[in-house]
């Protein structure tokens, strides 16, 4: 497998690239230094920070016995191998830290970046163990089971021939705002599985994939349950553990954060707003929008209701008419912490309060909004862990590699490399198409017409002195003739471009096909395509290959990987 590192600054996909904040965070130079020192507590590039964080986490108290019991119970249910489950005993020791990543549950695991997050957590845990052999680092995948965005969780897509096949799970007996973890998938999962089966070509691996997904996704299964079991199966050879924070046992461990939020709101939101203003002053965009109360209340129908602060000491649930005093809602939280759920602002705070988190592995969007939380962490008496970018890949199939070779040949520039072609494709696919047309017959028609237009304008202008001397009224005719000539030449240019495009339609069609594979729907492949398209073609060993590539490279560059 050939790998090519692409700088995030070079990636400008048709619909959406990467945020300025993330690009700066993954780069070198003063902008990054200013960003990390002002908006994060630790910098994973600074060796001294590792010892500070190890000392801080080792001396801090966590409910480690309860964590061991919770993780053991959940991961045994998800099907994690017993040999890996034994490693969970290590979390009882103050010298054991966690490397955390996470995502809301996705249908059949959702987009590729979910897999890349999990692999990144495993590989970075390995690196930390190699650096600090006296400590242990457990990779944990946080499954956002409290999430209520069913539409985002219930869809995925695969390539099917020359098109992209979307698979969408229809909601079944769902109420608005209902958490994805609290309701069965329902009968439409059958149609989803059938569509998946039809989309997978015959291969040596197809039958095993179909069998397992039929086992993990049944009508009575929840989305997070199917997701966890599928991920545990895919990563069965790795000591990766899963955590569902919707578990009542986990909510008990989170209650201190809930209490502080309800007791001091809206102070936490003010910290986010203040930090967001500083970000915007530096030219960055604020991603996360805080609420007055950054908690939801879970009602009897498993719907997440917003908690609104009506005035200083009274709260209301929305939608609904229930009103509670601050004392009442604190009492409710103490008696039933499982009824409360953090929003995007408090999720990271809860995570780092309950778990001894050494590093969080985040995607571009997550890193952007985590930059808003430094003061919020301090409000809850915490410091942020290392925030490390996840691995980022574009998987390039042989057919796309061959198309790139054709473009290189057509360009008339034998010195070009595949890396250059990929860099051009990731930066500006239209430029790649234009270069292919230009190089196809060694004629740069744009330059040819530009030279002709300049020469024609020059020659017509040379007529002016003689014509004006003969008859001043001829100057107006000359100007009209110049405009007509310019218009006629432009019309001829457009006809030439269309003729040239027709001549190269086959190659341009192939470039369009490669664009569909690299940027389906105009966004990076990793945000759209499902892993099972590739596992069906290239086998389960692909997971190991991706892990090997991650071990060999930093996660601060995008990796174009030829399969």
From Swiss-Prot:
The keyword Ligase applies. Its EC number is 6.-.-.-. InterPro entries: Bacillithiol_biosynth_BshC (IPR011199), CC_BshC (IPR055399), Rossmann-like_BshC (IPR055398). It holds the Pfam family CC_BshC. Residues 474-506 form a coiled coil. The keyword Ligase applies. Keywords: Coiled coil, Ligase. GO terms for molecular function: ligase activity. NCBIfam families: thiol_BshC. Belongs to the BshC family. This is Putative cysteine ligase BshC. The lineage of its organism: Bacteria, Pseudomonadati, Chlorobiota, Chlorobiia, Chlorobiales.
